Amino acid sequence: MKESEGIDLSTHTPMMQQYFRLKAEHPEILLFYRMGDFYELFFDDAKRASQLLDISLTKRGASAGEPIPMAGVPHHAVENYLARLVQMGESVAICEQIGDPATSKGPVERKVVRIVTPGTISDEALLQEKQDNLLAAIWQDGRGFGYATLDISSGRFRVSEPADRETMAAELQRTNPAELLYPESFESMELIDNRHGLRRRPMWEFEPDTARQQLNLQFGTRDLTGFGVEQAKLALRAAGCLLQYAKDTQRTSLPHIRGITMERQQDGIIMDAATRRNLELTQNLSGGVENTLAAVLDCTVTAMGSRMLKRWIHMPSRDIDALKQRQQAISALQEITPDLQPYLRQVGDLERILARLALRTARPRDLARMRHAFQQFPDIREQLAPLDTDSVRRLVSLIGQFDELRDLLERAVVEAPPVLVRDGGVIAPGYHTELDEWRALADGASDYLDRLEIREREKLGLDTLKVGFNGVHGYYIQVSRGQSHLVPIHYVRRQTLKNAERYIIPELKEYEDKVLTSKGKALALEKALYDELFDLLLPHLAELQQSAAALAELDVLTNLAERADTLNYVCPTLSDKPGIKIAGGRHPVVEQVLREPFISNPLSLSPQRRMLIITGPNMGGKSTYMRQAALIVLMAHIGCFVPADQAVIGPVDRIFTRVGAADDLASGRSTFMVEMTETANILHNATENSLVLMDEIGRGTSTYDGLSLAWACAESLANRIKAMTLFATHYFELTTLPEKMEGVVNVHLDAREHGDTIAFMHSVQDGAASKSYGLAVAALAGVPKEVIKRARQKLKELETLSNNASSSHIDGAQLALLNTDEPSPAIEALEAIDPDALTPRQALDWLYQLKKML
């Protein structure tokens, strides 16, 4: 608001003075200032809104001799404009007229009633139906981070403490917050620089004592031990800032936020940012949602179920007991899925309706939907009654009865209420006697007017006389211009038209006052009764939220039961013995988009068979085979059935993928640098229980550099880390690894040549591939025949040279470049030296000692 800084308020109208005072309280965000039927913006706000929303920029009055820039949007369309701004990461303060223009002396009283920010929206029109909308806060202390997320549209409050930047980057990608709060002194700006909705906050908002006080006050507790977060010092700093920001923007209490949960890495399968991206879990590599795992698995019938399924996909569980309970529920629900899903569909997005109820922003149709949801509960219970499994019984016990609340809403709210309570007609007839009386008075107007019109027409003999109502002038008696000279003296002219005159008489004026008063009284009483409904519903909020969560889970499990039936999935066996054994495995996404039948393949990994060296032609299916292994393991760890004939899945702590690569131009990193960064992350963090996918490692550099790196990485993964590894490569030299190392096995994807054409069999066979078929693939891609012919000649020359050259022998021992288990003694000694504490003589002695170590 630079243009309005340092202005003399006395030179402005009282209305603009009021604007400046309100804008000073919200200098960083857009202020929507209500003026009649419009929300107006001024100065820099107007210019910015004009650009962002493509609305007209006009002028109003003057400041310092210059016209004041102004832009506006109609009040009835404001939600559409807010939705667009929120998607761009903007925040908006909504300033409403709260005074009565009729009784106000000077400008109507106004105040900011809510602040709409990307991370704190709860309005249905502003939210993506099937995506969580998270507000997040981040804090850093050295290498470690504190991270908190809040979904204000459900009350879900989570914290974690990522140990390093890689883990923090993975958390940011997993949660994908709409708005991120960070402290002024935040060190790792490169982690968050490219995100929308960044909000810089003062350091004092992250004070740990203030955070504890805020959280205890919110939850009504003396300490946070019961939530398991008492010792999470970094996470609590982030949580305190986040909660304060949520309260400041909502301008109301947040009763639906009733607890906080600590998320620990070891609770789920850990996946870094590259793995989530490469496996295309909820977003494909182009940024869309088509052809992702979620797109295949998500046929949920409620939006809250869809959001829960995506959370499960992004955080696969390692709690075997919980996963087996999900499997049991899916097996049981397969019998009743077609009968149960129609009732679940009618429940709707109860989770977000309850959040709006808690924030007291629920609209009449929200209450009607809540009533409709309650009406489904008996049928849902009836459908579930025959199922005798612990997991289903648990869900049934969590779904409340709420017969009294259903009865209340059936009596109180009309069948099809209007959008807004201010439109009237929300409260049902018969619910409140006084309201019925006021409405009868207001609604009786038409009968009275008909009687008055007949009486006056007959009494005066004026056949053109009629009685009507106009929104500007109120009630009137209209007589044609030709008969207007015949009206009696007590007819007072109210309006002149081209062909008629309109009059008012004392009797009609008295009735008009009575009707308008009754309409106003009815609307005021209706608003009071509507607020009273909130007071009657909110004491049950905790049980309602619990029921909504149970119904969302029931929707997810019923959906997974339907998917298992429809897509021919089987229940995997979750074992405590290390290894992965899959018979007839299929890629869940690729098999859905292929026109021809998908070729299933087996996979066997164990401590005795821990690495597969995978060779075969481009387009042969190596990447698909590797990804399908990771996706089957992931699906098993969300409790889902899997695309296979049979599957036994042992303990898996992490999934890593190093597949495909592209230049990271924004960070100035080449394809090869991206590849090596991801590889380094795997070599540092993988364990013997990790599943590692390595696809074409080393191809981004020269042949011998690449081969050397690939060999050394394979050795390190097989010998030192002993991870379960699928290692796809075009370096045929690597197929000699099984001869040199235990637990390494060659497999290949088959292909057949027929003359100049090639047929990919897509089947995995034991042993190494005989050739790469690169030229055949190039021909398939449409490379000109003369180029293919020349390439065949050159290939023969190179193969002859290679066979004759003594340098073609690769010594595996020399190529283990990265397998440096033992650090250099000289480096260790250097790291232990404090140069500032040495005398010149001591420094010289150290030089001699280091020389001996080399």
UniProtKB/Swiss-Prot annotation:
One Gene Ontology term of the molecular function aspect: ATP-dependent DNA damage sensor activity
A cellular-component GO term for this protein: cytosol
Binding site for ATP: 616-623
General function of this protein: This protein is involved in the repair of mismatches in DNA. It is possible that it carries out the mismatch recognition step. This protein has a weak ATPase activity.
Source taxonomy: Bacteria, Pseudomonadati, Pseudomonadota, Gammaproteobacteria, Enterobacterales
Name used for this protein in its record: DNA mismatch repair protein MutS
Pfam family of the protein (one): MutS_III
Family named by the database record: Belongs to the DNA mismatch repair MutS family.
Keywords, in A-Z order: ATP-binding, DNA damage, DNA repair, DNA-binding, Nucleotide-binding
Keyword check for DNA-binding: yes
Originating organism: Pectobacterium atrosepticum (strain SCRI 1043 / ATCC BAA-672)
